[in-house]
Amino acid sequence: MGLLESVKSINWEHESSPVYQDFRVLPLFAVFFPSIRFLLDRFVFEKLAKYLIYGKHRQDMGDDTTERKKKIRKFKESAWKCVYYLSAEILALSVTYNEPWFMNTKYFWVGPGDQTWPDQQTKLKLKLLYMFVAGFYTYSIFALVFWETRRSDFGVSMGHHIATLILIVLSYVCSFSRVGSVVLALHDASDVFLEVGKMSKYSGAERIASFSFILFVLSWIILRLIYYPFWILWSTSYEVVLELDKDKHPIEGPIYYYMFNTLLYCLLVLHIYWWVLMYRMLVKQIQDRGKLSEDVRSDSEGEDEHED
């Protein structure tokens, strides 16, 4: 039986309780990402970056300037992130789109049957999504130190990766994975447009970069500033209280509730903060007649570069 047949034979609808022991497979996912990135860097991203950045002037490839080397390095980083965010988005949608809670947030907390939060079981396919994302952020912590371009927001990025990994693990064990999967889908969709825009900027495709930035801004507004607070946070703040059996969970129920809502509202604050930065960038783009300026959100470098 081949690998594809083995994967198809797995019952991805099987349900079981989420436990810390499930994360024993995390190292496998954490090793998977640098392996795939290394192969893509060497055989795809490097060639694609040089082709798009040098264009038809391939005779200049032997005369790399420092600026072009930086662009190639950053292009490869954005290409890798784009591949991850796109694959994570596809995986998140494939896991959630046919679930009742994809369209009705009430089912974050009830079902199937008489299951109610936090005593719900988790399907194997949802566990796979969580291991996939947790593996990526575990790898990202080490990549930020040893692989990525050193940027001026290194400390913020490291704190973000560590906090995200902790939130993923805790939300999994505390049965917030249904909400978590939708939150992941909301975020990854915007990030795909961001990375496409950055790759276009590095390769000089200003129109594509501007169009991607517009899509990024629109998706940010719709998904993170409208849907996230008025549907997701409303459900985690109000709907969950209606379903929680306070007699059965008099202590851990409120602890989970306040802990995760605090983190989720902090995420909303970050969304608003980044939106202010993007608004300034959008105004500058209009003033510059559509030319996209540097990415104020995540690409302001204090160039202590790391070689690939």
Curated annotation (Swiss-Prot):
It is a multi-pass membrane protein. It is an enzyme of class 2 (transferase). Keywords: Endoplasmic reticulum, Lipid biosynthesis, Lipid metabolism, Membrane, Phosphoprotein, Transferase, Transmembrane, Transmembrane helix. Disruption phenotype: No visible impact on ceramide and glucosylceramide species with C(14) to C(28) fatty acids. The double mutant loh1 loh3 is embryonically lethal. Rare viable loh1 loh3 seedlings have a complete absence of very-long-chain fatty acid (VLCFA) in sphingolipids and exhibit strong dwarf phenotype and altered lateral root outgrowth associated with disrupted early endosomes and an impaired polar auxin transport due to abnormal localization of auxin transporters in the plasma membrane; these phenotypes are in part restored by external auxin (NAA). The chain crosses the membrane at residues 25-45, 82-102, 128-148, 154-174, 213-233, 258-278. One of its GO terms (molecular function) is sphingosine N-acyltransferase activity. Its EC number is 2.3.1.-. It is found in: Endoplasmic reticulum membrane. GO terms for cellular component: endoplasmic reticulum; endoplasmic reticulum membrane. Inhibited by the mycotoxin fumonisin B(1), a sphingosine analog mycotoxins produced by pathogenic fungi. Repressed by divalent cation such as magnesium Mg(2+), copper Cu(2+), zinc Zn(2+), manganese Mn(2+), calcium Ca(2+) and cobalt Co(2+). Pathway: Sphingolipid metabolism. SMART domains: TLC. The keyword Transmembrane applies. The modification Phosphoserine is found at residues 298, 300. It comes from the Eukaryota. The keyword Transmembrane helix applies. Residues 73-287 form the TLC domain. It catalyses: (4R)-hydroxysphinganine + a fatty acyl-CoA = an N-acyl-(4R)-4-hydroxysphinganine + CoA + H(+); a sphingoid base + tetracosanoyl-CoA = an N-tetracosanoyl-sphingoid base + CoA + H(+); (4R)-hydroxysphinganine + hexadecanoyl-CoA = N-hexadecanoyl-(4R)-hydroxysphinganine + CoA + H(+); (4R)-hydroxysphinganine + octadecanoyl-CoA = N-octadecanoyl-(4R)-hydroxysphinganine + CoA + H(+). Pfam families: TRAM_LAG1_CLN8. Expressed ubiquitously at low levels. Not observed in pollen. One of its GO terms (biological process) is ceramide biosynthetic process. PANTHER family: CERAMIDE SYNTHASE 1 LOH3, LONGEVITY ASSURANCE FACTOR 1 LAG1. Essential for plant growth, promotes cell division in root meristems. Catalyzes the biosynthesis of ceramide sphingolipids with C(16) to C(28) fatty acids, structural membrane lipids involved in membrane trafficking (e.g. early endosomes) and cell polarity (e.g. polar auxin transport related proteins); active on a broad substrate spectrum, both regarding chain lengths of fatty acids and the sphingoid base, such as long-chain base (LCB) phytosphingosine (t18:0). Mediates resistance to sphinganine-analog mycotoxins (SAMs, e.g. fumonisin B(1)) by restoring the sphingolipid biosynthesis. This is Ceramide synthase 1 LOH3. It comes from Arabidopsis thaliana. The lineage of its organism: Eukaryota, Viridiplantae, Streptophyta, Embryophyta, Tracheophyta. The gene is LOH3.
